[in-house]
């Protein structure tokens, strides 16, 4: 999901489909792959954190994400304008020149936020609602 690359997605789905029978027979041996299968079926909740990593406000946003259990979470962070390697960070500007968080599902994002409390609310709502399929 970080790159939104259809070729990577095709390969991942092929790997999951190829191992479907063994995953059914021996689920405890495939914990990570079962998590990937869940993400493929139900979609991901994506969080983009944009800002200077060392700042206290950026760390507060990181802490808000880290303190919530969100199944199928995809997280990316970094400074604005340096998103060539991570498509999730594309077109995600700072709001009022402050570190900004974007919570997205199925290529649609909640309103961008700059404070940890509002980000926590968005993450709680996202975890309750679950993700939507992106395929």
State where each predicted segment sits.
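Aromatic (Trp/Tyr) and acidic
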Residues: 1-135
């Amino acid at each position: 999901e970080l790159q939104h690359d259809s070729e990577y997605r095709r390969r991942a789905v092929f790997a999951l489909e190829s191992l479907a029978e063994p995953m059914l027979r021996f689920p405890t041996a495939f914990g990570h792959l079962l998590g990937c299968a869940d993400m493929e079926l139900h979609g991901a909740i994506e969080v983009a954190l944009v800002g200077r990593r060392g700042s206290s406000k950026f760390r507060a946003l990181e802490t808000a994400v880290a303190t919530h259990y969100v199944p199928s979470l995809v997280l990316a962070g970094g400074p604005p304008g340096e998103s060539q390697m991570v498509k999730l960070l594309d077109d995600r500007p700072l709001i009022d020149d402050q570190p900004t968080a974007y919570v997205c599902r199925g290529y649609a994002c909640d309103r961008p936020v700059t404070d940890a409390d509002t980000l926590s609310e968005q993450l709680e709502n996202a975890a309750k609602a679950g993700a939507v399929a992106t395929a």
